[in-house]
Curated annotation (Swiss-Prot):
Residues binding GTP, per UniProt: 19-26, 81-85, 136-139
Originating gene: tuf2
EC supergroup of this enzyme: hydrolase
Region (G1): 19-26
Protein name, UniProt field: Elongation factor Tu 2
Length: 396
């Protein structure tokens, strides 16, 4: 049977559930699809369908992730849920599932636990911009004061990691009761309150085409009589014929002008996010551009060599290293289309990093890369992926 046509009428937002093991992330995911489907249509998913998450690969790393979708009055949501803690770490660091906002699930009976804290920290490090809290298992707590105490703890924890704890929406409910169709305040109505919080608290994300122009350079050709053509896939924004643009990274930044855009051998007047194009550059020599640089709107992105990052190191069973690495480790960092060697500095007090760990590090690259916070990269040794990371903060 054919799947229903995807109606692109409502704005699209990516979200996901995060939080400690057994606090009810998957049950809540099932409850959201079940309750919202009754009102807005779509497909309900039960717990077992979500819990049996298929494997996918991102940046050479295998991750188990479940994807569900649902609609509210005003939006279409794609929602990710992961079965295990390690899958969350990998998912957030590789950006396999970019989240415009996260639903932090906290059991009202237990309060914040170690993974609650770790997921909030990860969300901060990898640039998840908004968190909404679902205080789950409210049916197991009779004491209103206890509920308030847990809520205060969660708000303090969010504030500690630079989220606006005092202004964060916290919805109290029971995913289990909602799933069973319970009509009390903590049953189905709690799911509708959560949906309303998603709709109002998470702003509609900027579409890629509305961003500032950026295109990673994949290949460079010289066409006699016409000049230099750079090919690649436009990551965001639009480039028009006649635009002044910059070539950034690896070498000193140079300005040039786009004198032509072609796609599938046809000349266009512009290329936009998602297009695989060739961009003709006026007066630029073939040897002035190379793979690993980017074409970008003038002044929009700068080259950097030093940054802090959150990384996940592949386990031995994932094809990663078999041994730990230490301070001064020098692998290659693969940004967009090229490898650059860099030296790793471990945080004070961390002796070594084992395969399977995630850790915050500082990196010094031997050549500058066009970089902004939130940029993803792979860590490689001789072409083999041994880890993944995301730029947390640029130092210089």
């Amino acid at each position: 049977m054919a799947k229903g046509k995807f109606e692109r009428t409502k704005p699209h937002v990516n979200v996901g559930t995060i939080g400690h093991v057994d606090h009810g992330k998957t049950t809540l995911t099932a409850a959201i699809t079940t309750v919202l489907t009754k009102k807005f249509g779509g497909e309900a998913k039960d717990y077992s369908q979500i819990d049996n998450a298929p494997e996918e690969r991102a940046r050479g790393i295998t991750i188990n992730t479940s994807h569900v979708e649902y609609e509210t009055e005003t939006r279409h949501y794609a929602h990710v849920d992961c079965p295990g803690h390690a899958d969350y770490v990998k998912n957030m660091i590789t950006g396999a599932a970019q989240m415009d906002g996260a639903i932090l699930v906290v059991s009202a009976a237990d309060g914040p636990m170690p993974q609650t804290r770790e997921h909030i920290l990860l969300a901060r490090q990898v640039g998840v911009p908004y968190i909404i809290v679902f205080l789950n298992k409210a049916d197991m707590v009779d004491d209103a004061e206890l509920l308030e105490l847990v809520e205060m703890e969660v708000r303090e924890l969010l504030s500690k990691y630079d989220f606006p704890g005092d202004d964060t929406p916290i919805i109290k409910g029971s995913a289990k009761l909602a799933l069973e169709g319970d009509q009390s305040d903590i049953g189905e109505p709690a799911i509708f309150r959560l949906a309303e919080a998603l709709d109002t608290y998470i702003p509609t994300p900027e579409r890629a085409v509305d961003g500032t122009f950026l295109m990673p350079v994949e290949d460079v050709f010289s066409i006699s009589g016409r000049g230099t053509v750079v090919t690649g896939r436009v990551e965001r924004g639009i480039v028009k014929v006649g635009d002044e643009i910059e070539i950034v990274g690896l070498k000193p930044t140079i300005k040039t002008t786009c004198t032509g855009v072609e796609m599938f051998r046809k000349l266009l007047d512009q290329g936009q996010a998602g297009d695989n194009v060739g961009v003709l550059l006026r007066g630029t020599k073939r040897e002035e551009v190379e793979r690993g640089q980017v074409l970008a709107k003038v002044g929009s992105i700068k080259p950097h060599t030093k940054f802090t990052a959150e990384i996940y190191v592949l386990g031995k069973d994932e094809g990663g290293r078999h041994t730990p690495f230490f301070n001064g480790y020098r692998p290659q960092f693969y940004f967009r289309t090229t490898d650059v060697t860099g030296a790793v500095e471990l945080p004070a007090g961390t002796e070594m990093v084992m395969p399977g760990d995630n850790v915050s590090i500082s990196v010094s690259l031997i050549a500058p890369i066009a970089m902004e916070e939130g940029l993803r990269f792979a860590i490689r040794e001789g072409g083999r992926t041994v880890g993944a990371g995301v730029v947390a903060k640029i130092i210089e």
